[in-house]
Amino acid sequence: MGKLSTIGRIFFGIAIAVLGALTIYYDDFPYMLIPPKHSWIPGFAIVAYIFGAMLILAGACIVFEKMIKQASIILGTMLFLIFCFYFIPYQFIKSSEYIHFGAWENAAKELSLAGGAFVIASRYFVNKESLLNRFLSKIISTGAILFSITIISFGIDHFLFAKEAADYVPSWVPYHLFWMYFTGTALIGSGLAVIFKIKVRQIASLLGIMIFIWFAILHIPRVVFSPSADLGSEIASACLALAYSGIAFVIAGGATKKIV
């Protein structure tokens, strides 16, 4: 892997591991990993510990390149199954706001992490002539598309909820609404570019840089100055930004590599 992909892989692995640590520390899942109403799950604390440990292990495997293909495939599959068989039913059955685009934001975050795990796996996957490997190659080849679709949806959110989200921009940055619309445009354009393979290396690199800048100037200060009641959510949001930046860098670094 090139330097850009290596940086992205490490970013993503760290983010996943920290999400796992948060799950164990708070005896609960970060807000985007499963829907909020999960009290029906028997032995929930034990489930949270096991899931958190799996995230830490997967993150460590990704960072240190140990069984990284297997860890990434398992991680991506697990997150994708949660999206399909928990988030989607929850949105239609339990949530009364499923017709509103913004109500799907957390589900999209789950899907983006699943796509990111498949992107990582695709960089280490070597196709062998077996039914299982052909099946796996089809699944992991969707990673960049899944990630790009969610990035586009986040861009649309920046337009739909620009005024509500403008306060997230640091106070010392002028023209808050401009930056909301600029970021939304950049996210939508980047997602479309990756899907349609238009200057993927350059645009994915710029996407990763943009998200990392927001990670540094927006999310880190919010973590540092957050009240204790909100600290877990702010750390989780920072992890998402770091993960997205990492995924974009891995896509950029592997833009010339044919997935087999």
Where are these regions (language model features)?
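Extended, low-polarity transmembrane helix blocks
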Residues: 1-28, 44-57, 63-160, 178-185, ...
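Membrane-interface interhelical connector segments
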Residues: 26-40, 132, 159-176
